[in-house]
Amino acid sequence: MDTVIDRDLHAASAQPWDLLVVGGGIYGAALALEAARRGLAALLLERGDFGGETTWNSLRIVHGGLRYLQSLDLARHRESVGERGWLLRHFPDLVEPLPCLMPLYSPPRGGRLRRPAVLRAALMVDALLSRDRTLPRSRVLGVEETAKLFPAVDREGLRGGALWHDAVVPDAHRLVVELLRWACRAGARALNYVEAAELRVEGGQVRGLRAVDRELGRSFELKAKAVASCAGPWVRRVARRFDRDVPGLFRPLLAFNVLLDREPLAPGAVAVASRQPDAQTYFLLPWKGKVLAGTAYAPITEELFHGRIPGEPLVEGFLRDLNAALPGFEARREQVLRVLWGRLPAAVEGSATPAPRPVIHDHGREGGPRGLVSVSGVKLTTARSIAEKVLGVFASSGALRLADRPAEVERPAPDPPLPLDELTRLAEEDWGAARDHLRGLVQRQSVLRLEDLLLRRTDWGIDPVRAESAARLCESLGWRASRARPAAAGGMG
């Protein structure tokens, strides 16, 4: 646990950088790691907390690209399988195999995709193209075996089930932090609550940017050869600020998942859809002893929102869809613990269909500042492979020179928090030891706010009921709420 995410603004502004990464979600963290491994001095800036927006609100499934076989996109299937394997190998403490079961029905329910013959062929192709996979082989099950694994399955017209394995990252927020710890070990730095305010350009070439510490409101300058914007839903806004609007970068749609206070339906994820031929498929998977269901999509409109969550009509409609897909499930609004929502890129303006492919926009090639690249990703799985492509764009434009091969930098030993029950017990037995554990976590992982601690360094605050007791425990152990504090204090008195 020797690797620290050190929020040292003075040190960051004192040296020149090869690459500034704007955005601290999964895409920014992966790019910071790959840049550092390729010999670049990389600094990541996140205007909020690491992994606090789209990444935190995701369904947490690491897909292997089975759906790409429907369109015969073999290259993307292979990429997804490879990246899923990379995550499983390098983060076995955070990424685990996930059995996925899709019930299969007689036509017309579910269209061609849910017919046994079609799924059997797709799974066979998937196996042939994934010979180096480490997950169990996929197979088509009979009716009784399907019902045994998924007792709540709708048996009307049931002809069996397709069973395959993907992966899941239950603590996606910790995956971001562990990527950043690895990047820091490789020589990068990462600063949260720092906003990229203004690009510095000389002679058409990126020279750095002006940044703002959002904790204290102070500006400082950063010198760099190149800037990559991985700002997620804000990538288009950053493009306007640094260059000009690029509509194709990000056309927003609403995406949300719902955490239900229900017992898990099966050991892994189940894929369900209503009896309408073109009904959307939803996944329901176990998460923290509850059921996480999604993903639902809707066009972005003002009337969708009441405050910061999707409006009640959308949530109620989603629950109706789930209940139609699973007669007898009877999910109710009062069982909703959290609505995890965010913005994803849409295929076209005003659409409820997600964009099918990521976008990498080299501003210099379009008459903008040379050394500025914007990235809009579409799935968690391929964040690292997209990072490699972004570095390739910088290299081909001459903005950056990369080492021929990534350096063999060993990932730091994981730095997990204690489970909340264990910390509570430790506080009762040895208050000082519990306080030291909390203080160390806060200082090593750049925790500035209590929300960051409860939701993005730990899972203590995911259940709203437990969140209150977790907050009281942290305050009893010395957490203080002052925002205007030195980074070294880390919120611990």
Predicted feature residues:
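Core beta-strand elements of the Rossmann-like FAD/NAD(P) dinucleotide-binding domain
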Residues: Q15-W17, L216-A226
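A conserved short coil-to-beta-strand element within the FAD-binding core of flavoproteins
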Residues: N192-R207
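Helix-loop-beta segment of a Rossmann-like dinucleotide-binding subdomain
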Residues: L129, A147-A186, G208-R210, A296-H306, ...
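Glycine-rich FAD pyrophosphate-binding loop
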Residues: A36-N57
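Dinucleotide-binding Rossmann-like beta1-alpha1 core, especially the glycine-rich loop
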Residues: R60-L149, Y282
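Extreme N-terminal leader/targeting segments of oxidoreductases
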Residues: M1-L19, E34-R38
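C-terminal catalytic lobe of FAD-dependent flavoproteins
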Residues: R174, W182, D245-L254, L259-L292, ...
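Flavin (primarily FAD) binding-site architecture
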Residues: S229-R244
